[in-house]
Amino acid sequence: MIDLRYLALVLAVTDARIAIAQQSSPTVSPVSTTVTVLGSSAPISLGESARTAIVFDTQQNPLEFESVEDYLRTDASVDIQQRAPAGVLSDISVRGASFEQTLVLLNGLRMDSAETSHFNLDLPVPLGALGSIDVLHGAGSTLYGSDAIGGVVDFTTWKPEANALRLRAGTGSFGENQQAVLGALVGKRWSEVIAGDRDFSTGFIADRDYRTENASTDTRLASPLGTTELLLAGDDRAFGAAQFYGDYNSWERTKGWFAGLTQQFDSHVQAATGFRRHSDIFLLERDQPTGYKNQHVDDGFEGSLRDRHEIFQNATLLTGLEETTDHIESTNLGEHGRNRGAGYGEAEWRIPGRGSISAGLREELFSGGRWVTSPMAAATLWLPHSFKLRASAGYGFRIPTYIDLYYSDPTTLGNPNLKPESAWNFESGMDWYPTPRIAASLTLFYSRQKNTIDYTRASSADPWQATNLSGLHFAGVESAVDWRVNRNSQLKFSWTLLTGAQSALHGLESEYVFNYPVNDARAEWRWTPIHSLFLDSRLGVVQRYQQTDYPVWDESLSRESGRFRPYVQITNLSNTGYDEILSVRMPGRGFVGGIEFAITRKR
């Protein structure tokens, strides 16, 4: 079980520090008014949502985190399984679902790779150019399609309100150095954001070096046609992959290109299209470049049209059409392609201050003639004393990636006979808003899966084999408290307990699905001790299935105003030895420090 002494230590320190900063402030924003774009037919405040959703404002304190994974870790229901820092090959799962069962979006457009879901978090947009991260807990296939079994994560780019220039440079442990640049221009009817960043490290052990580069340009324009947004982005990541895929000192390099165009014609109709291309070069043994080698190039196209209308007072109908194509050329997998089209609708009736009810249905047709139907229903009910009850049910599905189907190397074998996986998800919960500064939630959830895709083997002498598991289900409880003490201090706590049916393995070893946390507790304290200084302290204690618990404590301190803004980020302050993926060791205590030069001028 989780050793709560770690949490007690942080709470004791926190209470002492808060006493210094206590003061009343009417400017603190109510917790319940934060708006999410996920889980509903229209953007909605968290206080009115029938689903569990988390929103991170990545522009509020831009120097506190090094990567998007650091933001996501503060949610106890989100499990980040990282192989290296700086966003190098990270897996994400929600509520115990596998990393392949979580859909990642960028400005509402799919970022999934037809090759493998290991690359879903290969975001080509620099962290500084993002504005928010929305996380939906539970199935979302009715609105978002394949892969949204365990949850959905949507990264949204930043919309500037003033001209800005930011230049940043830093250095730290393990030979790390980082640079970033961002420029923003704002006109009367347009805006432009250009950003780039680079992160390099010689590695904390041999063959764990990395170099990541990201660049993007984001253009917004208002015209008689409506509001247009064009996002162009690319990334390049090269890294040592020691023990990533077995007992080999491997090496890998990936590149990504993304183009997304969104056209909001009026308050009702939106059209969007996106193109994503991803390449991957993999050497099984780094010191043998002429040995076992794979090269993959996959691309995907997506087009969508949405219409949202108020059909009568307080009732909204959302309808949409989507078309998606995937294609891959690979030295290992061969050449393959597939496409699918979908139509969906969701109706929602909301009575202000009383509650809401919604229902939706999606019909999706895949090449080859397979139809998938994805229904959902949700409801909320407000009770006296600021209590809100909520419940939802939904169906999610996922088609296998090409790695799942066709891959073959000395350690891993695909399976061309794999069936698509699916799940019914149910949840019920209660939210409480005793004051505008406090929000508390408790949620019970259950997921009944069918044909879950995992890689299994009888013993360590055998290769991993892709297979469908039957009879797998998860049940759990998640809780969270967000307390905005005053304008200078905020406390956040979350805890998720998870259990599941393990008989699905039938005595086999599991590579991915059974690496989920059975206990995950998170505590975060955000504090501004004096004007412009910002301190963020984060503690996570995780216990994975059939493993011992481990604590990881991170701290960051930065200046958040002025032209020159020094910062320091300390990771794994407790110097814990741990791995988030079996046998892939994570770094011990490390730090990065530097300075940012920033200018902001409003028109």
Pin down the residues of each PLM region.
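N-terminal periplasmic "start-of-domain" segments of outer-membrane beta-barrel proteins
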Residues: 32-69, 91, 99
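Extracytoplasmic beta-strand/coil segments of soluble accessory domains associated
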Residues: 38, 69, 73-109, 131
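Short acidic/polar hinge/loop motifs at secondary-structure boundaries
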Residues: 110-137, 156-158
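Short strand-turn segments of transmembrane beta-barrel domains in outer membranes
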Residues: 140, 152, 156-185, 195-206
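Conserved C-terminal beta-signal and adjacent last beta-strands/turns
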Residues: 182, 220-223, 391, 512-603
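Flexible loop and strand-edge segments within Gram-negative outer membrane beta-barrel domains
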Residues: 201-216, 225-300, 412
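Outer-membrane beta-barrel signature, preferentially recognizing the C-terminal barrel domain
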Residues: 245-266, 296-298, 382, 395-449, ...
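Gram-negative outer-membrane beta-barrel transporters
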Residues: 318, 351-354, 445-448, 468-542, ...
